[in-house]
């Protein structure tokens, strides 16, 4: 059985380094791969190969990101590191690199700096659930009291953004010294790895979450009823399951009387699979692209939300001019566009291409959404921005 085979594989956890420029994020990333390769086996990566991050395009947005992997005895980690601040902003907002937890790097020589704060705020907005702190460059600070002061500052800053600042793990170390092979500092990297293992819970697999499938297409089959097709985003749908059809119109209920894939009938459809679901008693005209099939009660339709948005630069194919409050583009959620009205924060008069901004959006039709849902902003089919739902208002 395929499932039994999968269980032998270590749980897979996605993490990343965040923090102010030049505080040592990339050096730490290199140190983790080197020390853990030495201690637990695996492949070491040097600073230059991580720092020379390849450019990727996610939804038309250019992002430079380095991906490294490492293992602890119980887990396999995929770790992202970005060279520039703008890359972090884009990465976190588009969800190109979903993080189950982040390692916040703060130089003990500087303490928290503007981007430290900005990355913590972004983590809160986009729903990074856990943060572990690595205080770097501690070999350069002789004064024990100064280290305590910086630790206190970092913890207070995290608490300010609703992270458990007093309780989360904070490791004082030196990424450079660990990379140079000094045992005392290498041990701090192992301590960091242990903190990742113990503090970040094993992420729930998509298949174990509540069932949801965005509807891509609808057609009727003579004598059998209405079939909706799409890719199962999470969970499992089985024959005779009750489901809700959510978004755009009033929520309705139906029963799934059949699941098919490549014209073969199945007992169930699982996360990641492209399926057709046959719905009992649902008419072809009652369902449309852009709605979702979902486990009853698991997701609600909403029209108004606060979001964190990155606006594409002109070079990325975005707008050439700024926009102002009352801007009415299309918001593309999962499989469909819905027009929405934009309100900007107090004191923000206009938004320039290349900016990131917090905005409140009111859609003209409700969409099934939870906090953390990603969307694109489009004008006439062209993507001009990317965003994430930070807070649902109504």
Swiss-Prot record:
Transmembrane segments: none annotated. The keyword Hydrolase applies. Residues 60-64 are annotated as: G2. Residues 19-26 are annotated as: G1. Residues 174-176 are annotated as: G5. It catalyses: GTP + H2O = GDP + phosphate + H(+). One of its GO terms (molecular function) is GTPase activity. It is found in: Cytoplasm. It holds the Pfam family GTP_EFTU. GTP binds at residues 19-26, 81-85, 136-139. Residues 136-139 are annotated as: G4. GO terms for cellular component: cytosol. InterPro entries: EF-Tu_GTP-bd, EF-Tu_GTPase, EFTu-like_2, EFTU_2, G_TR_CS, P-loop_NTPase, Small_GTP-bd, T_Tr_GTP-bd_dom. Its EC number is 3.6.5.3. CDD domains: EF_Tu, EFTU_II, EFTU_III. HAMAP family: EF_Tu_B (MF_00118_B). GTP hydrolase that promotes the GTP-dependent binding of aminoacyl-tRNA to the A-site of ribosomes during protein biosynthesis. Monomer. This is Elongation factor Tu 2. It comes from Pseudoalteromonas translucida (strain TAC 125).
């Amino acid at each position: 059985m395929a499932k039994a085979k999968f269980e032998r594989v270590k749980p897979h956890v996605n993490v990343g380094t965040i923090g102010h420029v030049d505080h040592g994020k990339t050096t730490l990333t290199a140190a983790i791969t080197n020390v853990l390769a030495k201690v637990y086996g695996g492949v070491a990566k040097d600073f230059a190969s991580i720092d020379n991050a390849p450019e990727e395009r996610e939804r038309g947005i250019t992002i430079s990101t380095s991906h490294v992997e490492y293992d602890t005895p119980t887990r396999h980690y995929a770790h992202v590191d970005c060279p520039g601040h703008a890359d972090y902003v884009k990465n976190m907002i588009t969800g190109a690199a979903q993080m189950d937890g982040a390692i916040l790097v703060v130089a003990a020589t500087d303490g928290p700096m503007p981007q430290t704060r900005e990355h913590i705020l972004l983590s809160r907005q986009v729903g990074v659930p856990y943060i572990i702190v690595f205080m770097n460059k501690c070999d350069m600070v002789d004064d024990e009291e100064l280290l305590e002061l910086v630790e206190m500052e970092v913890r207070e800053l995290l608490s300010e953004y609703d992270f458990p600042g007093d309780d989360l793990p904070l490791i004082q170390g030196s990424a450079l010294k660990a990379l140079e092979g000094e045992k005392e500092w290498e041990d701090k990297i192992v301590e960091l790895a242990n903190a990742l293992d113990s503090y970040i819970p094993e992420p729930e697999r998509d298949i174990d979450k509540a069932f949801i499938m965005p509807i891509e297409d609808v057609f009727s089959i003579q004598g059998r009823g209405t079939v909706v097709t799409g890719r199962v985003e999470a969970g499992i749908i089985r024959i005779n399951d009750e489901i809700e059809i959510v978004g755009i119109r009033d929520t309705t209920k139906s029963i799934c009387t059949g699941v098919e894939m490549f014209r073969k009938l199945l007992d169930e459809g699982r996360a990641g699979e492209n399926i057709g679901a046959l719905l009992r008693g649902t008419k072809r005209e009652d369902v449309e692209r852009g709605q979702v099939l979902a486990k009853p009660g698991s997701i609600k339709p909403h029209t108004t939300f606060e979001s964190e948005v990155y606006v594409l630069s002109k070079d990325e194919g975005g707008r050439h001019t700024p926009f102002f409050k009352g801007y009415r583009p299309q918001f593309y959620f999962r499989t469909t566009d819905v027009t929405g009205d934009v309100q900007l924060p107090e004191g923000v008069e206009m938004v320039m291409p290349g900016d990131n901004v917090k905005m409140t959006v009111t859609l003209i039709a409700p969409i099934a959404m939870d906090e953390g849902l990603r969307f694109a902003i489009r004008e006439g089919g062209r993507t001009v921005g990317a965003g994430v739902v930070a807070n649902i208002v109504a």
